[in-house]
């Protein structure tokens, strides 16, 4: 049983949902990023979703794009990102870790080379954001070869065929997108058909569902959990705290700690 399955079972027994923060690795630099990730875990994060710095993050809003640029400007590439994950895994042997990234970063190292490195540093799951389901088989095969769980996005406009495919292919968890468009904490309008999507995924025996995009407040976490998903992912709101406190390390960490505590508190069912 993988770390994600173990965590979801544990939370279920404790009558809690999962709170999963997203950050870009090495934002604003390697050492600060490690401190930030430690702060997230120490204050209640149930799992981590981590992004690799990339120069053209098409799926991200301006907040995450800025995080990518800060990390790249600090001289952090894929090599440093893997080193940072290894450091996190060494400190937190049981925290589920997933990666969210674009296919180009994987191709630069070959499929097997990338997933092998993921296994070496302790990654549990990988979500390749820009690979359509129809083209996903080589990724799935390579991931499974190294015991990495392939994760897929369920888009807000998913039809029955897509729901079935996502439920069958996605392991560890499913990333349910709250709404169409780019990520941003400002835009908090949920897709109207979320309830049907959740029902459809569960009908096909899906992995636990984590809902993301635009989740920035504790009340949203409560609402998300009421809809039947296993937890919430928050990215832009966290990265915004980092961005607003680039010159004040202590304030950055204390604000992140407070934010995660509030969001985690909202997962108590």
Curated annotation (Swiss-Prot):
One Pfam family this sequence matches: Trp_syntA
InterPro entries named among the record's database cross-references: Aldolase_TIM, RibuloseP-bd_barrel, Trp_synthase_alpha_AS, Trp_synthase_suA
CDD domains: Tryptophan_synthase_alpha (cd04724)
Keywords: Amino-acid biosynthesis, Aromatic amino acid biosynthesis, Lyase, Tryptophan biosynthesis
GO cellular component: cytosol
Reaction catalysis annotation: (1S,2R)-1-C-(indol-3-yl)glycerol 3-phosphate + L-serine = D-glyceraldehyde 3-phosphate + L-tryptophan + H2O
Molecular function in Gene Ontology: tryptophan synthase activity
Class of enzymatic activity (EC top level): lyase
Covalent S-S links between cysteines: none
Pathways involved: Amino-acid biosynthesis; L-tryptophan biosynthesis; L-tryptophan from chorismate: step 5/5
Active-site residues from the entry: 49 (proton acceptor), 60 (proton acceptor)
Entry superkingdom: Bacteria
SUPFAM superfamilies: Ribulose-phoshate binding barrel (SSF51366)
Entry EC number(s): 4.2.1.20
Protein role: The alpha subunit is responsible for the aldol cleavage of indoleglycerol phosphate to indole and glyceraldehyde 3-phosphate.
Subunit structure: Tetramer of two alpha and two beta chains.
Family: Belongs to the TrpA family.
Protein name stated in the entry: Tryptophan synthase alpha chain
Organism, as annotated: Histophilus somni (strain 2336)
